[in-house]
Curated annotation (Swiss-Prot):
Keyword Oxidoreductase assigned: no
Name of the protein: Large ribosomal subunit protein uL11
Gene3D superfamilies cross-referenced by the UniProt entry: Ribosomal protein L11, C-terminal domain (1.10.10.250)
SUPFAM superfamilies with a match to the protein in the record: Ribosomal protein L11, C-terminal domain
GO-annotated biological processes: translation
Superkingdom: Archaea
PROSITE patterns associated with the record: RIBOSOMAL_L11 (PS00359)
Length: 108
């Protein structure tokens, strides 16, 4: 490790912290550990930009939604798979547009 560098938290760690959970769900399809607003998912995507292969904010958000689903976190009270479908349908375009500048400014 380079002196002075910090280890960045993983996506899972950021999601767990956001829902105040200690561990992922052992059965994420049936047992949920918390719920986050869509905007928190967007903020995590921006924070993780340097570590993601996603070229767009929308793609990064979909990556974070996949991680949320795999650990038992819902988004706006819905399964992240449903939210991903809504992202593709343009339901969240206005929210994403609001964060586009922050995405562009983020390192990555």
């Amino acid at each position: 490790m380079v002196k002075g560098s910090q280890v960045k938290p993983s996506t899972t760690e950021l999601l767990l912290k956001a829902v105040s959970a200690k561990a992922p769900s052992g059965d994420p399809i049936h047992q949920k550990i918390g719920d986050l607003p869509f905007e928190k998912i967007v903020e995590i995507a921006i924070e993780k930009k340097p570590d993601l292969l996603a070229k767009t904010l929308k793609a990064a958000v979909k990556t974070i939604l996949g991680s949320a689903r795999s650990i038992g976190v819902t988004v706006d009270g819905k399964d992240p798979k449903e939210v991903t479908r809504q992202v593709d349908e343009g339901v969240y375009d206005a929210v994403l547009a609001k964060y586009e500048e922050k995405w562009e400014e983020a390192e990555g």
